[in-house]
């Protein structure tokens, strides 16, 4: 069954004096979807979230929620839930009172409130903390309570503004999975804001990558990672080898470009380009095979192994080419133990299907 559109932002524009924070931004959010707004500081992701929440009026454009035009509707009338990085729990109220607060505002009966609070605390796996105060809980537990308070009144859409940003990595990783499980089990609709690429990749059904007030690309995490549409997308999501070249051949099996140093390599291109045109080439480090001998891959680069860095289970190899430019390959630690030494002449090889060729900046 086709999912309904829960939210639409149409050509939303927002300026602060001469600064354009959002430039004609449009997105659709489907029912039950987990959509992440991802981008660096100043990309416009929080500005867009605040416009959707009704906390920041856009200069122009439209915001539709559940089929109703709500561009300038007050925040409390939009039926949305919000979770912030600072938890926003009332320190003088117990956990029960914090979670019950939105239900009391909706004038629910005491028995219904008791039932809902117990249910949502069980959902976030903190069933025995009703009488405690926020200060008695850890940061991770407080964030779970903030989530519980948001879930308890079953908002149409939940907006999350970098809710895990203040937590350490281990706890952040754990709560990422927990939020994703809650989303999957409850079927809630979520818009999530983060600058953390890994967080976006782990949690999202789709990612909306933003840069300088514009949407660079929207798609599944896999699409953005393996099929970036711009240099910014290729560079922002994960690590990549990027270089320019001129188109010398186009065929069904791929496009061939030539670098300034004369090295020719092939990849997949979705753009319409002409022979002789300058384009950009991307290959992910994990898709490169490192060897002392030339392998069977369609593409290869030969050079001096400049540096080897072990990072736990992964090892990075830095290859210096004849023009002193650099390529990086990543392999599982131990796969070349003892066989490769810094200073060796080595080959980096990769498949045409793993490389992307793109226009633009």
Where are these regions (language model features)?
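The feature captures the beta-strand-to-loop junction immediately N-terminal to the Walker
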Residues: 38-40
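ABC ATPase nucleotide-binding domain helices that frame the ATP-binding cleft
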Residues: 46-49, 145
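Helix-to-loop junction immediately C-terminal to a conserved catalytic motif
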Residues: 53
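Conserved coupling/switch loops of ABC nucleotide-binding domains, chiefly the family-specific signature
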Residues: 59-62, 112, 212, 244
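Conserved ABC transporter NBD signature motif
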Residues: 61-69
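ABC ATPase nucleotide-binding domains
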Residues: 75-81, 85, 89-235
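Non-catalytic connector elements of ABC transporters
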Residues: 240, 250-361
